[in-house]
Structure formats: structure tokens, C-alpha cells
A protein has these predicted regions:
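Class I S-adenosyl-L-methionine
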Residues: 240, 248-399
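Helix-to-beta-strand junctions that scaffold the AdoMet/dcAdoMet cofactor pocket
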Residues: 139, 235-237
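Mobile active-site "lid"/loop adjacent to the S-adenosyl-L-methionine
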Residues: 152, 185-230, 236, 242, ...
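Conserved class I S-adenosyl-L-methionine
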Residues: 117-126
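S-adenosyl-L-methionine
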Residues: 147-184
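Conserved SAM-binding loop of SAM-dependent methyltransferases across substrates and taxa
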Residues: 127-140
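Polybasic, low-complexity RNA-engagement segments
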Residues: 1-57, 315, 330-335, 340-543
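Short beta-strand element of Class I
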Residues: 141-145
């Protein structure tokens, strides 16, 4: 059946006919494929160049986007780029200079408004676009714990935070409903972008037309309530929780928020319309009917938590949430609610401590967990680089750059068994940490093998003995695959991993100095640098 016919016969359109007086307008704006939209990474020193490239191909800034960074609508549909533009877009994404992301999915991180130095939780994080956006808000200070419960999606999350190149990310693997309270003091801000039926995603996932049923939202409601409830429990007094779905169904949206407010003290909603004044949204609802799986209004009984709230104190707050309709924003449909915990919100009384474990009594973290760099490795690194960067971690054979706030969480005391057992810090347990920070270098046979290209711009100013300023012509020659000896490059006293800095443009490139000087750049980074510098693009790859 053609998609347009399927859409017109869909249960979803029947439901929207109940929720809106003008369902035909919604349908007209919910069918065409989405435009390609991207977010530019402001943590990269050449972000202005990336923005210039986007302008050059006819892209337009998204007017309602609030930085840091910028967001753009490209002049073609999602996935429809061709030729050199398609290749460069892939390169810019791969190297972390931009992130492909649906425009409406940028809204939650804007509403969260994380500040540098804060400790943030992204409770349902994969594939990671919102995590990387939070990292951009944090800059070089703070931590965002990116949690994912599904094994197969954890790898995708790690890949994306590594690609982005932020020092603040920490990837953890838990069921969000039971994620441990680490740090014990709680999080400054929490994003809860819950699993949902995706009724707002018809332009991205046309299969929704044939699959969506009202019973789907009811089946997810309890999970959504549990995830948001855990977030409210984990956020600090004075902290903020953002609840987000790509669903238009009030059972997954306002009903979830109302149930959490019903069971929480000292928590109130903040107006999303005021936080995002330029977004064409609609105030949340205080009333909605129950729907059967034909999309019609029904009198069948459903649990109280899925019904409109009878409490005036809760109902009066629901219009502070915001629903974004596909046709109003020219993209996907979305729902947002912002909850804030008051400074004097009652905290659950701490139970009496029954056991206080020593470091020796606690099961150690997995060998694969990141840990602060041990003394013996620190000596090797300092010998190789002439200095030891702060906040350096080790995971396997990989050196990672992080932040003081991540280390503070690792050092902090925590508890188990509801607080009855105290555990000393200096570990991640009971938190299961998979990856953190920016990959900086690799070890091989006990020595620092090389500096990872994506970390060169971070490490260069910290490592005067492991970096050299050179004329731009020299870097151009290396990009053009000209053979060069250490003497010709002016690094005759250097062996091993090194960073060359263009003294004019401040471009940083990772090299290996042996018998000759070799660029340690992947194809994507090599192509972008060549384009930036006006060179012909070569296909050689060293990394």
C-alpha cells in the first residue's frame, strides 16, 4: 500500500483527529521526508570554518537553536547528499566537527541548560547525540554520565562520544530505573529521553503509520514513570530534570509527568515555553480522552496514572510542558517537560549504617574499567612527553583525557543496600563504567606509541616537549605525501609520537617520527585539512 494511503487510513491519524481540530494540517506536515540537519561542535577550534562550509553549500541556521555552537538545515533531505558534499558531510561527522541530528531532538539539551563544572546524567543516552550536545554545554569542565541499558547500543554510544572528542563524557551501562546513586550527592541535571512509541517520528520512520496503536503507549507508561521517578530521586535539591519523548500521546507525556508529581515532594514544573521562546510549541494538556486501538474515544477503564489528573495542583502545572507538532515546526513531533527540585525538598532519611567496608573488602572494578593513570604508567608518559597532563586515565592500553569532576566522582564515598553499607571511594563500583573522556594516546609494550589525531589540539598546549611549531608549508608537504626526514622537518631530536603545530593557522597534526616523519591521520581528517588548506585531496591513511 502506498505510504500516503497508509497514512490516511492509519490509527495514528484517527488519534490525532481526537487530539486536534485540524488533523489534515498535521497530516500535511507529517509525511514528507525530513531535511538533513546538523549541529556544529563548538569545542573544535575550526568550528567557524565548518560553519562557513555549511553556508557555502546553501545551509541555513536553525533560528530557535540556542548554543553553544550552532545548528543548521541543509538544502536536501536526510541522507540525500551526493558526490563531494556527501563525502565531506561524512568526514565532518566522523571527525566530530558536526553531529547529524534531527532538529527537534536538539531541544532537550537546550532545555536542560547544563553549565560548565556540573555533573549531569543522560539516563537513556544512545546513540549519543544528546550526550554530545550536553558535553558542548559543559565545555572543558564537568561530567555527563551517559547511560544505556541495551548491550548492542552501548557500543554505538561509545563510538559517538569518542567521535565527538569531549573530555566530559562517561559511558555507563545500567537499567535506568535502578541506576546506582553515584555520586551520592546526586546530579545537578538529568535528561530522561525515554523509550516511546514514536508517534511524532512519521517523517523519519514511516513504518509508524502502519504500526502505531494507543495500546503501545499504555504498555510503555509504567516504564516511563519509573525512569522519570528515578531521575527525580537522583537529582540534587535545586537541580533540574528534563523529560522528553518523540510521542504525541498524552498517556506517554502529560500523564507520566502528572504521576511523578503525584508521588514526589518539593518538585514543580518550569515553563518550557519560557525556556524556549522561539520554538513553535503548544502548552501541555490538562485533559485527554482514552482511546481504543481503533483510534476512537472509549469509556474502557484504564489505570488512574494514565488519566487526566483530578488534583488541581498537578493539573495547573501541566500547561508548563510543551508539545511540538510536526506541522508547526516543520520537522518531527516532540514533547518536553522540565521539573525542578526545590532547595528545601525533603530527602529520604538515611538508614543507619550497618557495615563500613574497607578498600580491601570491596570487589575491585573490572580490568576493563577506566582508572586514574597508575604511577608506573605516569612515569613512562612523563618521560615520553616531558610533562604529565592533568586528569589522565588508563583503560586497557589507551590513555584518556578527562576532567577534575570525573575524578571527584571516582574518589567519592558511596553506599549499597539502600545506604546500609558504606563503600570507600577510589573506584567506580557499583557503577559500571565502560568508557570515559577523550582518547589521547596508546601504549605498546610499556611505551607511549603515538598520540591520537583527535587529541592533538588538546594536548599540544600542555606538552611543549611533545610538540613543535613549524611553517605551514611543512604540514602541506606532509599532506601531499612528500617524504620528509626528521632533519628536514626540524625535529631531529625527536623520536616517536609528536605534534606539529602550524605557527600561522594553529592547525595541529599528529605525526610519528622515525626514519622519516609520517602523518598519523585518518582519511577523513586528512581530507578536511587538505580542503581547509587549499590542497588537493589524497587518499592515503596512516591511522
Amino acid at each position: 500500500m502506498p505510504w500516503d494511503q497508509l497514512a490516511r487510513q492509519s490509527i495514528l491519524l484517527q488519534a490525532v483527529s481526537v487530539w486536534r481540530d485540524d488533523p489534515e494540517n498535521w497530516l500535511a506536515g507529517s509525511f514528507d521526508r525530513l531535511p538533513e540537519t546538523v549541529r556544529v561542535n563548538p569545542l573544535r577550534s575550526d568550528s567557524e570554518w565548518t560553519e562557513g562550509w555549511l553556508e557555502g553549500i546553501g545551509s541555513e541556521r536553525i533560528g530557535w537553536f540556542i548554543g553553544p555552537g550552532s545548528a543548521w538545515t541543509l538544502p536536501f533531505n536526510r541522507g540525500a547528499a551526493e558526490g563531494d558534499i556527501r563525502e565531506m558531510l561524512a568526514d565532518l561527522h566522523e571527525t566530530g566537527r558536526l553531529t547529524r541530528q534531527e532538529a527537534v531532538s536538539m531541544l532537550p539539551a537546550i532545555a536542560l541548560d547544563a553549565q560548565p563544572g556540573e555533573v549531569v546524567l543522560d539516563m537513556c543516552a544512545s546513540p549519543g547525540s544528546k550526550t554530545t550536545q550536553i558535553s558542548e554545554h559543559l565545555g572543558e569542565a564537568g561530567a555527563v554520565f551517559a547511560n544505556e541499558v541495551v548491550n548492542s547500543r552501548v557500543n554505538m554510544l561509545v563510538t559517538n562520544v569518542q567521535r565527538h572528542g569531549s573530555r566530559t563524557s562517561v559511558v555507563v551501562h545500567h537499567d535506568g530505573r535502578y541506576i546506582p546513586r553515584v555520586p551520592e550527592s546526586g546530579f545537578d541535571r538529568i535528561l530522561v529521553d525515554v523509550p516511546c512509541t514514536g508517534s511524532g517520528t512519521t517523517r523519519k520512520n514511516p513504518d509508524v503509520w502502519g504500526k502505531w496503536l494507543p495500546s503501545g503507549g499504555r504498555s510503555l507508561h509504567d516504564l516511563q514513570v519509573a525512569l522519570l521517578s528515578r531521575a527525580v530521586a537522583l537529582v540534587k535539591p535545586g537541580g533540574r530534570v528534563v523529560y522528553a519523548t518523540c510521542s504525541l500521546d498524552p498517556v506517554e507525556d502529560e500523564a507520566v509527568v502528572a504521576e511523578v508529581l503525584r508521588n514526589s515532594e518539593g518538585v514543580d514544573m518550569k515553563s518550557v515555553m519560557e525556556l524556549l521562546p522561539d520554538v513553535p510549541g503548544e502548552a501541555g494538556r490538562t485533559d485527554w480522552p482514552s482511546l481504543d486501538d481503533g483510534g476512537g474515544v472509549t469509556v474502557v477503564e484504564i489505570p488512574e496514572s494514565m488519566q487526566p489528573p483530578s488534583e488541581q495542583g498537578i493539573a495547573s502545572q501541566l500547561p508548563r510542558s510543551m508539545r511540538v507538532w510536526n506541522d508547526k515546526i516543520g520537522g518531527g513531533g516532540f514533547f518536553l517537560a522540565v521539573l525542578e527540585k526545590s532547595e528545601d525538598a525533603p530527602e529520604r532519611p538515611a538508614p543507619e549504617v550497618e557495615v563500613k567496608m574497607t578498600a580491601e573488602e570491596v570487589k575491585p572494578d573490572s580490568d576493563n574499567s577506566p582508572r586514574p593513570i597508575p604511577d608506573e604508567v605516569a612515569s613512562v608518559v612523563e618521560s615520553a612527553w616531558g610533562a604529565l597532563p592533568d586528569d589522565l586515565w588508563l583503560r586497557g592500553k589507551r590513555l584518556l583525557l578527562s576532567t577534575p569532576e570525573v575524578h571527584d566522582v571516582w574518589e567519592s564515598e558511596r553506599s549499597r543496600r539502600g545506604g546500609r553499607t558504606r563503600i570507600p571511594g577510589g573506584r567506580w563500583r557499583p557503577l559500571k563504567v565502560i568508557h570515559l573522556g577523550l582518547s589521547a594516546a596508546r601504549l605498546r609494550r610499556g611505551d607511549v606509541e603515538r598520540i591520537v589525531a583527535g587529541a592533538a589540539h588538546e594536548l599540544a598546549p600542555r606538552l611543549p616537549n611533545a610538540s613543535s611549531e613549524v611553517d605551514g608549508d611543512l604540514i602541506d608537504a606532509l599532506l601531499a605525501d612528500e617524504e620528509m626526514s626528521p632533519d628536514e622537518a626540524g625535529v631531529n631530536a625527536v623520536r616517536g609520537g609528536h605534534i606539529l603545530i602550524d605557527r600561522a593557522t594553529r592547525d595541529c597534526v599528529s605525526v610519528w617520527v622515525g626514519v622519516r616523519v609520517s602523518l598519523m591521520l585518518g582519511k577523513a581528517e586528512r581530507r578536511i585539512l587538505s580542503l581547509k588548506r587549499g590542497l588537493s585531496i589524497t587518499e592515503k591513511e596512516e591511522e
